[in-house]
């Protein structure tokens, strides 16, 4: 309902609100997964209203990364194969080498040939992190990235997410109900009932 905001390039931005406030719906719209009933959405310099579904898919494949609460790993593929898939779709000739380097970076050098069912929740989310950064996205959307993890594991995943993001210079948008996590981002957009309650910068660097 009359939602308007901008996310600065290279910043870490959070969208918070109670269940049913519209957080995930808003993420879907911003990422071009859904179409708005009114208004315009610009993503990485492209007006999504001007693109058809195939063109939006190409834009996402090239510019956008995703991290989901339930990991969204392909169960019949190993950790390495899950990371390699988007690289191969982009025609990366050294997909296997890049995938191995990413899994080493997230601390899974000894688990890359394991299947998701053989990995803990924290390990699965680290595979998801490696996959999300594999195509060097301009912007990364993380939907409740620690929602299925215990507090200690969730903290390790967030530290890793922030570290990888800093190295890559990616714009990061986090959907969360965790205000403590939101306060570590540079800007917080608060939603309630599908409307913006506040949009404030924080002291986080």
Where is each model-derived feature located?
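ABC family nucleotide-binding domain
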Residues: 1-191
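H-loop (His-switch) and adjacent beta-strand-loop-beta switch element
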Residues: 188-201
């Amino acid at each position: 309902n009359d939602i308007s905001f901008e996310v600065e390039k290279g910043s870490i931005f959070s969208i918070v609100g109670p269940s049913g406030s519209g957080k995930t719906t808003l993420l879907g719209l911003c990422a071009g997964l859904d179409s708005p009933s009114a208004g315009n959405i610009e993503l990485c310099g492209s007006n999504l209203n001007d693109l058809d579904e195939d063109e939006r898919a190409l834009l996402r494949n090239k510019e956008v990364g995703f991290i989901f609460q339930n990991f969204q790993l392909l169960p019949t593929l190993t950790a390495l194969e899950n990371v390699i898939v988007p690289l191969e779709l982009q025609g990366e000739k050294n997909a296997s080498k890049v995938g191995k380097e990413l899994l080493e970076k997230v601390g899974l050098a000894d688990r890359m040939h394991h299947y998701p069912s053989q990995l803990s929740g924290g390990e699965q989310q680290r595979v998801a992190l490696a996959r999300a950064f594999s195509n060097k996205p301009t912007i990364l959307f993380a939907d409740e990235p620690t929602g299925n993890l215990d507090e200690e594991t969730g903290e390790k995943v967030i530290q890793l997410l922030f570290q990888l993001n800093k190295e890559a210079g990616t714009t990061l948008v986090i959907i969360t109900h965790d205000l403590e996590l939101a306060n570590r981002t540079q800007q917080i957009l608060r939603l309630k009932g599908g409307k913006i309650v506040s949009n404030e910068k924080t002291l986080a660097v």
